[in-house]
Amino acid sequence: MKIFYKAINMTLSMFTVIPLPKYEWDDRAAKHIMKLYPFIGLIIGILWYLSFFVLSKLNVPIMLMAALILTVPYILTGFLHLDGFMDVSDALLSRRDKETKLRILKDSTVGAFSVISVVLLLLVEFAGIFTVLNKNLDMRILIFIPIASRTMNGYFIVSQEMLGQSSLAKFFKEGTGKVDEIILLGIYVLVALITFFTLGINYLIAILAMGLISFILLLKVKKELGGINGDVAGYILVLMEFTGILLLGII
């Protein structure tokens, strides 16, 4: 139980900016981090929904509310995944050979493609959130979207070939196996079912579309880069959540 508590502490510290008591790193607890990744999604999702609830009670104008809601998950995660999205976008959009793409991925310099990509992403995501608010949809979906994205991310990290030898994602994979993969896939199915029974079919379609786009992105990245790492996981997570919001704005 103590190991599990440490794992929760470590997971929250790694993937959020939520202040926590100091702790000592424990390699035995690290193997549980990916299984707890959906829990991080739950925390972020609840805080995301609460931000909407508070803003709506304050009668904040819809356009401003959409902009503020957009920032919440990025702020809570310290822009960790958005940074990965920018790095991978820069590499993939360069249209260079595999070795050059990998070199670009490791380069800390902010490239033009990454800037263009993040600006377009945030503009369209803002429009999506604004549309969802304007359509008066059930905003409890904000709880489920981060859980789904992090569940699939955890599954990819424990099941896929790692990119590079020094990847932190590779460290998280150590000590995991088929049981972890089954648990994470089971959680995704559970999230989909709860979404359907509490919110309805349109919201289920959004969750399933997030899963579909994640596999499409995974295949693309594996083809062009050869595997997955922390940046790739962030890239997939950001586009999964973007897909969920965008689809709700359309259907």
Curated annotation (Swiss-Prot):
Belongs to the CobS family. The chain crosses the membrane at residues 36-56, 60-80, 110-130, 181-201, 202-222, 231-251. It is a multi-pass membrane protein. Joins adenosylcobinamide-GDP and alpha-ribazole to generate adenosylcobalamin (Ado-cobalamin). Also synthesizes adenosylcobalamin 5'-phosphate from adenosylcobinamide-GDP and alpha-ribazole 5'-phosphate. GO terms for cellular component: plasma membrane. InterPro entries: CobS (IPR003805). This is Adenosylcobinamide-GDP ribazoletransferase. It comes from Clostridium perfringens (strain SM101 / Type A). It is found in: Cell membrane. Keywords: Cell membrane, Cobalamin biosynthesis, Magnesium, Membrane, Transferase, Transmembrane, Transmembrane helix. Pfam families: CobS. Its cofactor is Mg(2+). Its main location: membrane. GO terms for molecular function: adenosylcobinamide-GDP ribazoletransferase activity; cobalamin 5'-phosphate synthase activity.
